[in-house]
Amino acid sequence: MVTTNRLVLSGTVCKTPVRKVSPSGIPHCQFVLEHRSTQQEAGFSRQTWCRMPIIVSGQQSQALTHSITVGSQLTVEGFISCHQGRNGLNKLVLHAEQIEFIDSGD
């Protein structure tokens, strides 16, 4: 059985983080990360773009999330999973296990 599930994505926070506490008392922070880059595919440059919902869970990670605002540039590493929305549609979500702020050089 294959069990590898890792994703690293960098980008800019494009939606205001929402903080909630689950019925079991686990704090969660949700936001959306927008990624834009140029990648090489089959010897050609290709513009890539995506918006990825991010979930940060657990008490230890919450202190870091209070510094995250719209416009923050981050590198996020974690695992992906499907979540079913209220509309019944599945969406891919990145569960962050490590977050690093990208220095803008200012």
From Swiss-Prot:
GO terms for molecular function: single-stranded DNA binding. Keywords: DNA replication, DNA-binding, Primosome. Residues 4-103 form the SSB domain. GO terms for cellular component: primosome complex. InterPro entries: NA-bd_OB-fold, Primosome_PriB/ssb, Prisomal_replication_PriB. GO terms for biological process: DNA replication, synthesis of primer. It comes from the Bacteria. Gene3D superfamilies: Nucleic acid-binding proteins. Involved in the restart of stalled replication forks, which reloads the replicative helicase on sites other than the origin of replication; the PriA-PriB pathway is the major replication restart pathway. During primosome assembly it facilitates complex formation between PriA and DnaT on DNA; stabilizes PriA on DNA. Stimulates the DNA unwinding activity of PriA helicase. Belongs to the PriB family. Homodimer. Interacts with PriA and DnaT. Component of the replication restart primosome. Primosome assembly occurs via a 'hand-off' mechanism. PriA binds to replication forks, subsequently PriB then DnaT bind; DnaT then displaces ssDNA to generate the helicase loading substrate. This is Replication restart protein PriB. It comes from Yersinia enterocolitica serotype O:8 / biotype 1B (strain NCTC 13174 / 8081).
